[in-house]
């Protein structure tokens, strides 16, 4: 039996797996055979790793494990298009994964940390603080978990968005190892253009991502177009002011030849006026940028509310005068706490209420 400290095979990229097997005397053929079993055949137990050499299988059983995520709680939206999962990790931590079904395609929103250190005031995860980084296997494991759900109904996954719990660029190494697994041609073989990473604006991470050969999409959570307004909503803005952030974004766009998506959560009376839109338009004018406008998902602990539809339209109209395109992101799963961190917070509140009180 492998120990609790044995290597989780899902934490390894294909080169790392090759290095492990090479130390045992097995070559690239055996590496790729095992890799295909994990990511193409979706093996979940060692018994399902049939076809491997008996000696290799024995070494795997003794020295590695197949880490699995377990469903702790799940909710389904009333329209049937959103499936939110609270997944339990080996140490008891829980993370959120959201499966969203659109016409002819499925998208999954995955987490990169248990909790988050960025502290965005309107985000339920930001109110929790950071517990720990996820390992590459825990990040990829969310995709594998969702793939099993989709396969049962004959569906396939098309898009992955790293917009769940946590800041991906705060867990850079593990997140990028997971991305490398997702795009590996012999594994899940996802196209990089179907993967989007969302960041609050970790400037060193944006610049590093620009310098590396991972042509995924980048989305930046902006929410304010002046330093003061942004820092009031996104405390990380105090560490990386807008001039530094926008310089990094321009560097990324020019280096990678890719459009950057900017996320703007519209909060009634806070950042949804024509004046706010003009300031944002001036900030982004001339960039290859697209704004995703997101009416706020109400969150316990934050008293802000979503903008009215007419305010959303007026905001977009102003952006258009600066030739800045925008899209209103459809809110999904409002009835099942599908906003980041909301399901975890709800389940934990219910658990606390159900605990017996001491005499």
Curated annotation (Swiss-Prot):
Q: Where in the cell is it found?
A: Cytoplasm
Q: How is the cofactor bound?
A: Binds 1 [4Fe-4S] cluster. The cluster is coordinated with 3 cysteines and an exchangeable S-adenosyl-L-methionine.
The Radical SAM core domain covers: 102-335
**Reactions catalysed according to its record:** adenosine(2503) in 23S rRNA + 2 reduced [2Fe-2S]-[ferredoxin] + 2 S-adenosyl-L-methionine = 2-methyladenosine(2503) in 23S rRNA + 5'-deoxyadenosine + L-methionine + 2 oxidized [2Fe-2S]-[ferredoxin] + S-adenosyl-L-homocysteine; adenosine(37) in tRNA + 2 reduced [2Fe-2S]-[ferredoxin] + 2 S-adenosyl-L-methionine = 2-methyladenosine(37) in tRNA + 5'-deoxyadenosine + L-methionine + 2 oxidized [2Fe-2S]-[ferredoxin] + S-adenosyl-L-homocysteine
Leading EC class: transferase
Q: Keyword annotations for this protein? A: 4Fe-4S, Cytoplasm, Disulfide bond, Iron, Iron-sulfur, Metal-binding, Methyltransferase, rRNA processing, S-adenosyl-L-methionine, Transferase, tRNA processing
Reported EC number(s) for this entry are 2.1.1.192
Q: Which cofactor does it need?
A: [4Fe-4S] cluster
- Which sequence ranges are marked TM in the entry? none
**What PROSITE patterns does the entry give?**
RADICAL_SAM
Q: Is the Iron-sulfur keyword given for this protein?
A: yes
Protein origin, superkingdom: Bacteria
Q: Which GO terms describe its biological process?
A: rRNA base methylation; tRNA methylation
**Where mainly found?**
cytoplasm
PANTHER family, sorted: 23S RRNA METHYLTRANSFERASE, RADICAL SAM CORE DOMAIN-CONTAINING PROTEIN
Miscellaneous comment text of the record: Reaction proceeds by a ping-pong mechanism involving intermediate methylation of a conserved cysteine residue.
UniProt name for this protein:
Dual-specificity RNA methyltransferase RlmN 1
Recorded source organism is: Myxococcus xanthus (strain DK1622)
């Amino acid at each position: 039996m492998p120990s609790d400290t044995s290597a989780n095979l899902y934490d390894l990229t294909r080169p790392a797996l090759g290095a492990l097997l090479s130390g045992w005397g097995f070559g690239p053929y055996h590496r790729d055979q095992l890799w295909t079993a994990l990511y193409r055949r979706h093996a979940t137990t060692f018994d399902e790793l049939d076809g491997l050499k008996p000696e290799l299988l024995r070494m795997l059983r003794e020295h590695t494990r197949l880490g699995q995520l377990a469903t702790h709680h799940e909710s389904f939206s009333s329209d049937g298009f959103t499936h939110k999962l609270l997944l339990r990790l080996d140490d008891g931590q829980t993370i959120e994964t959201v499966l969203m079904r659109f016409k002819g395609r499925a998208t999954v929103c995955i987490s990169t940390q248990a909790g988050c250190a960025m502290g965005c005031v309107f985000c339920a995860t930001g109110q929790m603080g950071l517990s720990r980084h996820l390992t590459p296997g825990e990040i990829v494991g969310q995709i594998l978990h969702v793939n099993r759900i989709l396969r049962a109904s004959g569906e396939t996954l098309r898009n992955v968005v790293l917009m769940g719990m946590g800041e991906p660029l705060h867990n850079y190494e593990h997140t990028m190892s997971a991305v490398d697994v997702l795009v590996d041609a012999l594994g899940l073989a996802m196209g990089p253009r179907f993967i989007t990473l969302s960041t609050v604006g970790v400037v060193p991470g944006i610049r590093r991502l620009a310098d590396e050969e991972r042509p995924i999409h980048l989305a930046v959570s902006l929410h304010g177009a002046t330093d003061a307004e942004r820092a009031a909503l996104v405390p990380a803005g105090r560490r990386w002011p807008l001039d530094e952030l926008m310089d990094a974004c321009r560097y990324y766009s020019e280096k990678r030849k890719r459009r950057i998506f900017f996320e703007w959560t519209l909060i009634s009376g806070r950042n949804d006026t024509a004046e706010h839109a003009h300031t944002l338009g001036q900030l982004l004018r001339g960039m290859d940028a697209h704004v995703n406008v997101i009416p706020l998902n109400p969150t316990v602990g934050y008293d802000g509310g979503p903008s009215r539809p007419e305010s959303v339209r007026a905001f977009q109209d102003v952006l258009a005068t600066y030739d800045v395109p925008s899209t209103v992101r459809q809110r999904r799963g409002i009835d099942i706490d599908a906003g980041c961190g909301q399901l975890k917070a709800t389940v934990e509140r219910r658990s606390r209420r159900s605990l017996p009180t001491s005499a």
